[in-house]
Swiss-Prot record:
Protein name: 21S rRNA pseudouridine(2819) synthase
Pfam families: PseudoU_synth_2
Catalytic activity: uridine(2819) in 21S rRNA = pseudouridine(2819) in 21S rRNA
Entry's family note: Belongs to the pseudouridine synthase RluA family.
PANTHER family from the UniProt entry: 21S RRNA PSEUDOURIDINE(2819) SYNTHASE (PTHR21600:SF81), MITOCHONDRIAL RNA PSEUDOURIDINE SYNTHASE (PTHR21600)
Gene (name only): PUS5
Major subcellular site: mitochondrion
Active-site positions on this chain: 84
E.C. code: 5.4.99.43
Role: Pseudouridylate synthase responsible for the pseudouridine-2819 formation in mitochondrial 21S rRNA. May modulate the efficiency or the fidelity of the mitochondrial translation machinery.
SUPFAM superfamilies, A to Z: Pseudouridine synthase
Record's keyword terms, sorted: Isomerase, Mitochondrion, rRNA processing
Lineage: Eukaryota, Fungi, Dikarya, Ascomycota, Saccharomycotina
Compartments reported by the entry: Mitochondrion
Gene Ontology biological process: enzyme-directed rRNA pseudouridine synthesis
Length: 339
């Protein structure tokens, strides 16, 4: 399907540079949009770094171009899942009465609608070792020699140890099922308890070992604290549960390093609200995280669509070496689709 690009919604990143959001597709049941880093999904303030008010303005302009009397009903467009403010990539905006069906599909309650979301993350590993050597240094690797259905759905008992579980000895594919501990602000059921909340979470992943990149001299010169003595590994991630900050949390727990330019995540996670401009990073020129919502597929009995979402304009530098213009290189695209 040929993407439909509309003129920009505007947003402001940490350095107050205007951003562009492209609408990838307008379907009768949903929209697919490409959110740059720095745009906030929740909130209804009429600020340029809040998603929905800008989306309403853009859609009204689009539909009014063909029908000057068109009246946009904001209640017909619902964000059914979210990306962290400094994560980029594809978002589904449900239209009309479809929002509940999408939300149910994320928890496997809707058998008539199937939605898959895959992400690409960048994991910086010390260049003195390979990723596999880095993993072995933990001394506690678990390899589950079972088929995928079994190892994803095996019943948990009180003796099951949660953590990082690889599918086989190649240390390429696996799951992360650490519990996630969060502030009560992240759990609507426990808003006012003042206690930390623990809940289960499950993440599938595939490390693309052969596609790792050594930062260029120019990258190291510009941002030495981010790139020096590092090798960057791309990793494909698919969520089986949808907890807040789940990918960022699971990467740190499983691999003992944060995603690229997410070095302050552990501090941010335990703060109710921060007015600090450098909330994620002090080593790069923005708060952008090396995490991108790169693939969405939506299927129902009457249709089946899939989307590979490019890196938004202005967010490419962090992904240097993994892109062909602003799209992922072919080998990564192929892995995204087939994983």
């Amino acid at each position: 399907m040929k993407p439909t690009f509309l003129k920009c919604l505007q947003g402001i990143d940490k350095n107050h540079a205007y951003r562009q959001i492209n609408i990838i597709d307008i379907h009768s049941r949903y929209l697919i949009i490409n959110k740059p880093s720095g745009i906030q999904c929740n909130g209804t303030k009429s600020h340029s770094n809040y998603l929905l008010p800008q989306l309403y303005k853009q859609l009204k302009a689009h539909f009014s171009a063909n029908n000057p009397n068109y009246k946009l009903n904001p209640d017909q467009y619902k964000v059914v899942h979210r990306l962290d403010k400094y994560v980029s990539g594809g978002l589904i905006i449900a239209r009309g009465k479809n929002a509940n069906a999408f939300r149910k599909s994320f928890s496997n309650q809707n058998t008539n609608l199937s939605v898959k979301r895959k992400y690409i993350g960048l994991v910086p590993i010390p260049n003195t070792v390979s990723f596999k050597q880095h993993l072995h240094e933990f001394g506690d690797l678990k390899v589950q020699h079972e088929n995928e259905v079994r190892y994803l759905n095996r019943p948990e008992s009180v003796t099951d140890k949660k953590g990082l579980i690889f599918k086989d000895d190649s240390l390429t594919e696996g799951i992360i099922n650490f519990d996630i501990v969060a502030l009560p602000k992240d759990d609507r059921r426990n808003k006012n308890t003042g206690e930390l909340v623990t809940y289960s979470a499950l993440t599938k992943f595939k490390i693309l070992h052969s596609m790792s990149q050594v930062p260029t001299n120019e990258q190291i010169s510009r941002f030495p604290k981010l790139y020096k003595n590092k090798t960057i590994y791309p990793i494909i991630i698919e969520l089986e549960t949808g907890r807040k900050n789940q990918i960022r949390d699971h990467i740190l727990q499983a691999f003992k390093v944060s995603l690229l330019n997410d070095d302050k995540f552990i501090d941010f996670k335990m703060v109710q609200k921060s007015n600090t401009a450098n909330i994620n990073s002090e080593v790069y020129n923005s708060n952008q995280i090396g995490l991108h919502s790169a693939y969405i597929s939506i299927s129902k009995s009457s249709f089946a669509n899939e989307y590979v979402i490019p890196i938004p304009e202005g967010d490419e530098y962090l992904w240097k070496g993994f892109l062909d213009e602003n799209s992922f290189i072919k080998t990564i695209n192929r892995e995204l689709i087939t994983f």
